Each structure stands twice: as structure tokens, then as C-alpha cells.
Amino acid sequence: MKGYFGPYGGQYVPEILMPALEELEAAYEEIMKDESFWKEFNDLLRDYAGRPTPLYFARRLSEKYGARIYLKREDLLHTGAHKINNAIGQVLLAKKMGKTRIIAETGAGQHGVATATAAALFGMECVIYMGEEDTIRQKPNVERMKLLGAKVVPVKSGSRTLKDAINEALRDWITNLQTTYYVIGSVVGPHPYPIIVRNFQKVIGEETKKQILEKEGRLPDYIVACVGGGSNAAGIFYPFIDSGVKLIGVEAGGEGLETGKHAASLLKGKIGYLHGSKTFVLQDDWGQVQVTHSVSAGLDYSGVGPEHAYWRETGKVLYDAVTDEEALDAFIELSRLEGIIPALESSHALAYLKKINIKGKVVVVNLSGRGDKDLESVLNHPYVRERIR
């Protein structure tokens, strides 16, 4: 069925939003066939964002694990993460649709920075909604967004994190449909957003496939990526679905799955409806969306993209989780072994290397972003303070 991945996805939104989603779908279907759009998009990815990103052979990490480990270096993109791929695509689409105002939600701030960057590039007004809790955790990104000309609105309702920021952005969109384009930052939300975001991010997997064939002469045994909403994982996995490569999505295990303080929707969630989409949602016995926890602001989300729900159900991708402490260990390990400071989100994928037997295997880890934004929260974390004294 259109707009669904198996039983997941759809458009579970107020009636007032349906015309906007229909307008967006029609515009997107039009640009899918427009070669000039894709030329402009790809030129910007190359000349402005810095694609293709390298597939880097991590020599010392490989020696430690007895494997051949490659890092897909999305951290080297302009603004420091994979989010810019989608932001450029959607803001360009908004411009073609005649919109003048851009809004977005952000958790770790990376999508907010990327959207503010793209809005500045195209000369558009920009408002970013961010949970108040996240504005404290990610202060440098808040300052960046303001410098880029965006208005940052701290959201004080609910758990004051990503899901609340999305709620506020949706309220804004409903009020300003004529002028405003809502840039969703992950493969979540109502149709057609999950498909749009995945298609703007699949460049990651397409490049990876070409690069690994050049370097190894074959496809990898494993590809590992972190999963919050799931856009970096969808971007690298999509070109490898049904290729024989073992694909592993790593969720935020927080303080442990048994504690309830985590953000592992696919492992511990139930089927429900969140932000316009049918997917796996962390909810209580009454169906109320639960408060999530992760050391990483970008994975702190109580749902997950519907395509991931479908991949989980069909066994096309394996999903697991690592804890805050395991991710912090991986953050320090990559910094010390390779001189690369990873984002806390990406550190969850790196931490998974300890959980599987990869001896003699070729493994690609999607290094979705850099860790500058996380330095303060990592260095102030009691678990880390003991380890790097």
C-alpha cells in the first residue's frame, strides 16, 4: 500500500495537515523526475557539503579487533554530520515549492544546524524547535544556529526533549501551512517524509558500496549504524538490503534495557502511532508515550522510522542496543586509537564491535557525526572522569 512499509508508516495526522502532505508528495514526485533538481542537489553535496566522504580503513582499531574495519566518514561533512544531506535536499525542495519559511525540530542540534545552514544558503527564514533539556546539553549547537540566522525556540513541555520539539514544530506547521515547509530530520513522521529523507540519505550507502568494492574487491560482511529515528542507518543500509551483507542497527540502551531508562523502541517498544506514523513506540500499558533516556541527545527518541520497523519484522536488519557506558568507552577508544572523536550517537555503533565476533571479517561502521558537540557532556560524565584522569 502506498505510504506503507508492510503494515508500518501511513499518515495518521489531523485532517488539517492532509492538504500539506498531499502538496509535498506531489512536489516530491515531480522532482524525482527532474534531472535539473538532482544535478543542483548533487553539485551542492559535492561543492558545498564535501561529498563523497572517505571510507577510511581504521588500522589500529582493526588490529585490536582482528578484523578489517572501515569507517564511513560522515563526520567530515560540512556541519559535522550526515544531517546536511537531507537538509540541503529538503530546503531545495521547499524553495521549488515556493515556500519562504523553514521550520525544523532538533535533538542533538545537528539537524538544526544543518537546516539553519541550508536556510542561510538559500536565504530563507528559519525557526528551530529544540527540547529545553537538549538546549542545555548541546549549547554549542544552539549558538551555531543563532549565528546562522535561525531563531531557536526551547520547548518546555513534556520531557523537554526531541519528541516534544517535534510536537511543537507540527503545531507551528499547522498554523502556517501556506508559507512554511517543515524539514523533518529523520526517517520518521507521516508519509511521504520517511521516503524523502531516506532517498536524500541513501547517497551514504551508494558511496560505501562503490568504495568498499574498490578497496576490498567485495562487499563487507557487516555494516553497523546507530538508530534513533534512523536516518543515518537507513541511508547506509538501503543500498545493501537483500545483498547478503549483515546489517546491524544499534539502539540506545541507556542505563540498561531492564531499567526502563533507555530509548530502544525496536527492542522494547510496542506497535503504536507517533508523529503521524504507525511504528514501534516506547509506551506504557495505557498507550502513553514514555520518557526515554540516552547519554546521546540524538538517539533520545521514543519511536523509530517505519521502514526500520518493517526491516526488523522481515529480518532484513538485526537490531540490538548498547548502554551509555559502552558508548562512552567506544567514544574514548576511537579518540585514542585513531585520533577521531566520534559523536556519541556514532559511538553506539562503534561499541557494538565488542558484541559480535568479527575476527577476520570486513566491517563498515557508519561514523554519522563528529563529537565536538558532545565534549562537555562526556568530560563531565562521572563514568568518563574516572577513566581519563
UniProtKB/Swiss-Prot annotation:
Keyword field contains Heme: no
Superkingdom, natural source: Bacteria
Top-level enzyme category: lyase
GO terms of biological process kind: L-tryptophan biosynthetic process
Pathways per UniProt: Amino-acid biosynthesis; L-tryptophan biosynthesis; L-tryptophan from chorismate: step 5/5
Matches recorded under InterPro entries: Trp_synth_b_CS, Trp_synth_beta, Trp_synth_beta/beta-like, TrpB-like_PALP, TrpB-like_PALP_sf
Residue list for modification N6-(pyridoxal phosphate)lysine: 83
CDD domains: Trp-synth_B
CC per GO annotation: cytoplasm
Xref: PROSITE patterns: TRP_SYNTHASE_BETA
One of the Pfam families matching this protein, by short name: PALP
Subunit field text: Tetramer of two alpha and two beta chains.
Function, in words: The beta subunit is responsible for the synthesis of L-tryptophan from indole and L-serine.
Family: Belongs to the TrpB family.
Protein name: Tryptophan synthase beta chain 1
Source organism: Thermotoga maritima (strain ATCC 43589 / DSM 3109 / JCM 10099 / NBRC 100826 / MSB8)
Gene: trpB1
